[in-house]
Each structure stands twice: as C-alpha cells, then as structure tokens.
Amino acid sequence: MSELSATHFLLLSAALFIIGMVGVLTRRNVLVIFMCIELMLNAVNVSLIGFAWELHQLTGQVFALFVIAIAAAEAVVGLGIVMALTRRTDTVDIDELRQLRE
C-alpha cells in the first residue's frame, strides 16, 4: 500500500471543486447552488490540508480551520437570505427570482 502524497489530496480536491462548479452552473434551485458552493469551499480545505501534509507543517491545517469557521458563518447568513427569499416569493427557483428583478 502506498503512502499518501499531495497528489492524492489535490486530485480529490480538484474532483470535489469541479463537481461543485458544475452544480453551481447547471442547477436552478437556490439551496442546491448553496450546497455546491459549500462543496467548493470544502475542496479548498482538502487542498490546504494536502499541502500541509506534504510539507509536514500545521499551517495549512490551521488555515483550513479558519476557512471552516468562515464557511459556517457564511452558511448562516446564506441560509437566512434563502429563507427570507422563500418567505417573500414562495419559490427557490433561480429563474423565477430573476423574473422578479426585471
């Protein structure tokens, strides 16, 4: 069995980021788009941890903890906005929300 290297972490991170980006670009539900953005943030965390693993330093892991804390705050604010939009418009479809703007 081979040892983990930064390549393994970066491949996983790239796959997660691409899945999240495709979700943001193709989905119409605001909640699904929000979850895909969170997936992209987690992909960044995996890459930070991978670089920290390769360099044998804790800096990347500490920075990943800060990103997790910021993502939690972003999740609270984002879900609050989504809930307010849903109460006001009775929809979570991005196309219908665009029509309200026009």
Swiss-Prot record:
It is found in: Cell membrane. One of its GO terms (biological process) is ATP synthesis coupled electron transport. The keyword Transport applies. It holds the Pfam family Oxidored_q2. The chain crosses the membrane at residues 6-26, 31-51, 62-82. One of its GO terms (cellular component) is NADH dehydrogenase complex. It comes from the Bacteria. GO terms for molecular function: NADH:ubiquinone reductase (non-electrogenic) activity; quinone binding. Keywords: Cell membrane, Membrane, NAD, Quinone, Translocase, Transmembrane, Transmembrane helix, Transport, Ubiquinone. It catalyses: a quinone + NADH + 5 H(+)(in) = a quinol + NAD(+) + 4 H(+)(out). Belongs to the complex I subunit 4L family. NDH-1 shuttles electrons from NADH, via FMN and iron-sulfur (Fe-S) centers, to quinones in the respiratory chain. The immediate electron acceptor for the enzyme in this species is believed to be ubiquinone. Couples the redox reaction to proton translocation (for every two electrons transferred, four hydrogen ions are translocated across the cytoplasmic membrane), and thus conserves the redox energy in a proton gradient. This is NADH-quinone oxidoreductase subunit K.
